[in-house]
């Protein structure tokens, strides 16, 4: 009986020790490292919440450029202004925090304004939570005059990384939701010429010569899986096929290896970016970007061409997750 009790105690201790969350240093930079020893997965997150992220499976990276957060809007707008609640808001290029002449990637892609609020692990997962109080920063509010806060939790459980974002509207007006993320994936030890993209989407977003959405759509006629050797995309897709929980699954696969992005129901759009490699070089990456809306959604909604724009009411929150899962690596 004593031996059985001891084995039970050791078993529980082993489970509890499987997950680890720690703040440490990597080449002189402060990082948070999440570990799932049983699954062989390690996630590292740097202070900017952008390009300093990494996810390794059995020691091999499946990310090439971190998991940049694109907010308050994802990817491109058509003009140097946006519309919300029937009002036009021009950007001030002199502040230096908006790309021009095509505003892209929001205002926070490389921001160091995030504050860590929790780093913890238990028998079920390891996680880190960070917060950014947008309303505190005049240069941000000058470009996007909606008082709000972001909270992002990266949670590692069962070898799967969940990225959960919560937007809290602390202002007096409804705030449009057009955010997204820009993760770029890779299949270790396999050339992109051998990858297939599995994209269960019925509809493709039509764009102009600046890759800005026009408000038009067309049927997705691309093969599924799509051979990336012969296709380079910078394209949004919608009407995603979803499982019983409302989740959409998009993945790259080759040689028995798979890297999968899973979108929660409020991520209506998948933007696929797999640019051609420069002459004489390789570029083994494919971005599968979860987006709450198509590019230029703010202005297309005002023009009556995109009625599906989400918003968060004063005092309310908007929450959604996406997940990253790998197999065969």
Regions found by a protein language model. Give the residues of each.
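Extended, loop-rich substrate-binding clefts of extracytoplasmic carbohydrate-active enzymes
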Residues: 18-26, 92-158
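Active-site pocket scaffolds in enzymes
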Residues: 259-329
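A short, structured loop/turn motif at beta-sheet edges
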Residues: 83-88, 117-128, 155-160, 189-193, ...
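Sec-dependent signal peptide recognition
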Residues: 1-7
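Beta-strand-rich N-terminal accessory domains
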Residues: 17-96, 244-268, 276, 316-327
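Acidic, contiguous internal or C-terminal segments within carbohydrate-active enzymes
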Residues: 34-36, 43-48, 132-188
């Amino acid at each position: 009986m004593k031996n059985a009790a001891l084995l039970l105690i050791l078993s529980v201790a082993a489970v509890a020790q499987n997950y680890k969350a720690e703040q440490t240093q990597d080449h002189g930079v402060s990082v948070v490292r999440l570990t799932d020893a049983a699954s062989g997965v390690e996630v590292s997150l740097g202070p900017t919440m952008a390009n300093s992220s990494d996810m390794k499976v059995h020691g091999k990276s499946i990310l090439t450029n971190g998991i940049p957060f694109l907010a308050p809007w994802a990817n491109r707008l058509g003009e140097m202004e946006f519309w919300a609640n029937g009002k036009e808001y021009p950007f001030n290029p002199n502040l230096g925090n908006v790309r021009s002449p095509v505003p892209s990637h929001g205002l926070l892609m490389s921001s160091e304004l995030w504050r860590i609020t929790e780093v913890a692990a238990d028998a079920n997962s390891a996680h880190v939570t960070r917060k950014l109080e947008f309303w505190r920063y005049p240069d941000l509010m000058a470009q996007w005059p909606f008082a709000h806060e972001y909270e992002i939790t990266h949670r590692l459980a069962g070898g799967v990384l969940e990225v959960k974002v919560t937007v809290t509207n602390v202002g007096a007006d409804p705030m449009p939701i057009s955010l997204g993320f820009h993760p770029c994936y890779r299949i270790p030890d396999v050339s992109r010429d051998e990858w297939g993209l599995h994209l269960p989407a019925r509809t493709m977003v039509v764009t102009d010569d600046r890759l800005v959405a026009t408000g038009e759509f067309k049927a997705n006629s691309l093969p599924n899986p799509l051979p990336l050797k012969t296709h380079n995309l910078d394209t949004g897709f919608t009407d995603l096929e979803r499982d019983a929980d409302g989740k959409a699954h998009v993945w790259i696969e080759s040689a028995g290896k798979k890297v999968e992005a899973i979108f929660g129901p409020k991520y209506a759009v998948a933007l696929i970016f797999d640019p051609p490699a420069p002459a004489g070089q390789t570029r083994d990456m494919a971005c599968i970007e979860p987006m709450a809306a198509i590019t230029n959604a703010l202005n297309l909604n005002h023009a009556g061409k995109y009625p599906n724009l989400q918003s968060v009411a004063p005092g309310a929150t908007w929450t959604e997750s996406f997940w990253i899962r790998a197999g065969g690596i």
